[in-house]
Amino acid sequence: MSSVVQVLSLQAEELHARRREMADLRRQLADKELELSTAKSELNIFERRYQNVVGPMYAELDRVKAQILGLASKFYPKAENFREEAESAREQANEFQEENRATENPTKNFNPPEILKKLFRRVAKKIHPDLASSAAERERRHVLMSKLNEAYDRLDEEAIRPILIEWEEPFLETFELGEQLVRVVSQIAQVRKRLNEILGELEDLTLTEMYQLKQNIDSAEREGHDLLQEIADVIEEKIKKAKTQIRDLAYDFIE
């Protein structure tokens, strides 16, 4: 009997230690999920802002290029590449135009208030899919986590609070001591894996061309330079030169 008590005592001590470890990992996980969600939202806002500023200009530049190539194909009717490139330029112009329609009225910055960040952490610590002990529970948590990320991206505090009401976390006390220990150890492994995945996702995000452009533009703005407008000015100059080229080609064609 004493040996059984001793084993249970050791399990209880181990469970207590693992729960402390798990509590710390939950905090880390919530913080990292918040960091990732914030980074994605900030980049999404920037992409819409960038597209809203330069998208129409790129579309116009491609339309002008298509006109140039169209005229060139008339000068050289046997040159198939001119017609193909003209069609490609028109398609690219249409794509830029469609993308711009989808990104109208972008918010300049993504600035979630501190109360929203705290609420995100609180909810994420409770519902995160990597705390699941079964496939069904994991799926349910995944749905709620998706709702949380979407609401956070919209800065919608009122949409986040009902997620807590919807969630009813099972109590560990309903399991035997040994089962509780196994469950917590499994959760720890899952959370550590997810933390590594988040670090990888953040690193991949920072290596994208759009993220690096955002960093450069943000850095320039802090120094009082509007780099985005400078990019737009460069495109505008290209458009002017291309239009001049069209006039010259059209004149030659008439001659």
Model-predicted segments: where are they?
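C-terminal accessory/regulatory regions appended to core domains
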Residues: 1-255
